[in-house]
């Protein structure tokens, strides 16, 4: 039977796709339905049809799944931030474990590998230490802020996101109130006019320090002192800055920073390591789970105090400084110069001297240091972006033959692809651990431990 756009189907949702969508079948025709939960019986309208599969819009939940829960957020279906709020947290964790295992099996070709139980959260809300709120206007001309609807740049008005810290709403109310009082216009992407583009808020979970950074299409905001005075009524306020971005693009932050009040950074800690965090710093957004993740990476590194370690894609030195406590020496590599400046500052802040940091691409720095300067590694740790590791880097790791490789990944598909290369001959997949860094979303972090086969 042929199905077409706008057809209405009754579906039993039997599986869950990698993006959290429900999967059902009608006469062999597979339909992917956003917001449907495994175990649901639903009515769905076909919005896109191919020969053997299509995409549907959830019209009605006829019989709810035992795993379906009422979303804690009233706009969960419109907002692009959460994909799994209608799924019980226990089932979210199972979905993420299955996703990682499936990628390692299908893409990596691995079988019968040891996988530890996923590390979830006791309280899977209010976990984000950073949020970036776009500012705009609704159809009535009212200033709004919140998050983009999925796959759009349409702002869903929401100042009280349940993933962020509770103090965010107070900040947003004060900034939007200031804009209304002093007739400050939000930035308009279509015209390139308007001033306020985004409001960034960062929060130190262990220090209760708060940073507000206004991203402007200009150099200053009207009545700056009045805004600073208002924000400083928030007890946790530590840093207020302006970031200037006058370019017509979708990049949030520009290069120019100006301090309005307080420090230019906040401080937070992971374990017993403290970090200075600026508006431009990369820092894991879930500090509670990051400590578990890095603890697992340290465990898989198997350090005794005699090892030389390379930490590739090291950011502001978060993993490097963790490793340095147990290693003889650690070398970190990161392409962003300011991140390396932060890493060096963080090493000084913690009195850690057995580290060295390099600015550059990991796939350029590591081959250069190995082939020209003869450096080696007992352990190599990689924590690449979603696209995974460069082929040149993987080949250099195979040439260097460290005893162990620890791979920290935010994308299990590219992880599986890279592991297939590393484990083709020289390395064995020893341990796999997953961490739920982003509850209510489909994202999951994975740590993998590899051992050289001849050791």
Go through each PLM region and give its residues.
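Rossmann-like S-adenosyl-L-methionine
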Residues: 2-10, 18, 223-455
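Extended interfacial segments that mediate partner engagement and assembly in macromolecular machines
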Residues: 59-71, 77-186, 206
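Short beta-strand micro-motifs enriched in acidic
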Residues: 45-49, 134-138, 202-206, 451-453
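Short, acidic/hydrophobic/Gly-rich beta-strand patch recurrent on exposed beta strands
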Residues: 22-27, 146-149, 213-215, 343
